[in-house]
A protein has these predicted regions:
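N-terminal glycine-rich FAD/FM-binding segment characteristic of electron-transfer flavoproteins
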Residues: 1-308
Length: 308
């Protein structure tokens, strides 16, 4: 596994790497350059660095898998309520954990009542819920949420981290996998656990023509986002024995580098993932869209569209 390294002693602060980075992943700070989660390990900066301050280091032998165990579910809240994908993730986590003797954990980040909402997860067989509750988490700021979840991962060392394939989850998961220099498989539709704790992540590829099987064999944790409504919802257990742990939140953790200039609360509209009935229109629908919209309303569903 390759890791991108920076030697501040060799850096001349020429800025060539910043100018050439195609992803805007390098910024200049007082102490030198820093790399953020936009880095794709493409190597452009390494080739541009004349002083050899940036270089790739080959990590030998991979992670010691025995030091990483358990499955961590990111429990997303939507407008103060638990997102339904969380219960699907817990159900899948319990199935995977049973095969290798793991425990199932959850982590929640939010404002007031987050710890109260965490109680909803215990009846579904979660062994421990880690809660990061602070008013500074009001409104989703990807950097702050990533700091909180990364803190949990660093302390817990889970072998697998499952995140819902929502808009929030798709923003959060890549930041986390980059921080831990490990892999991420997005939009999984099926998960399997090997006896050696490698997670087989299955997802459609090439427009759904094939199903790709992806394994992160040399690094931990293993990150995967899972599409909503493709896994079975978790069943409640007879005797819940889990607990809730409220974690300390530092001021740095809630100090965001993102400045919100304005915000507008939109009326909640059901997403197509939540609908039981969909009327789908393609490019050829033309002037029939009004009729299709009326049909969707009569059927109690929603009108949606294919790719252009």
């Amino acid at each position: 596994m390759k890791l991108l390294r920076f030697d501040p002693q060799l850096c001349t602060l020429c800025g060539a790497c910043i100018d050439k980075c195609p992803f805007g992943a390098i910024t200049m700070e007082k102490t030198g350059i820093t790399l953020n989660e936009n880095c794709r390990m493409c190597g452009v900066c390494v080739r541009q660095c004349q002083s050899k301050a940036l270089y790739f280091e080959q990590k030998a032998g991979g992670e010691d898998k025995s030091t990483w165990n358990g499955i961590l579910v990111y429990a997303e809240q939507e407008r103060g309520k638990m997102h339904p994908v969380v219960f699907e993730l817990i159900g899948e986590a319990r199935k995977l954990a049973k095969k290798v003797g793991y425990k199932v954990y959850a982590v929640m980040v939010g404002t007031a009542r987050t710890a109260e909402n965490a109680k909803e997860l215990l009846p579904y067989g979660v062994d421990e819920v880690f809660v990061y509750e602070h008013e500074g988490f009001a409104g989703f700021k990807a950097d702050c949420y990533a700091d909180a979840v990364a803190d949990c991962i660093s302390k817990l060392h889970p072998s697998v981290v499952l995140v819902g394939g929502t808009s929030l989850g798709r923003s959060l998961a890549p930041r986390l996998s980059t921080r831990f220099h490990t892999g991420l498989t997005a939009d999984c539709t099926k998960l399997e656990m090997k006896s050696n704790t490698d997670l087989v992540q299955i997802r459609p590829a090439f427009g759904g023509n094939i199903m790709a099987q992806i394994v992160i064999s040399e690094s931990r944790p293993q990150f995967a986002t899972v599409r909503y409504k493709v896994m079975d919802r978790a069943e409640k257990v007879e005797k819940p024995s889990g607990k809730i742990t409220v974690c300390p939140v530092s001021e740095d953790m809630v100090r965001s580098r993102i400045e919100v200039l304005s915000a507008k609360v939109l009326e909640h509209v059901r997403s197509i993932e939540e609908e039981d009935v969909l009327v789908v229109a393609g490019r050829g629908a033309g002037k029939a869209l009004d009729q299709l919209k009326e049909l969707a309303e009569l059927l109690g569903g929603q009108l949606c569209f294919t790719r252009p």
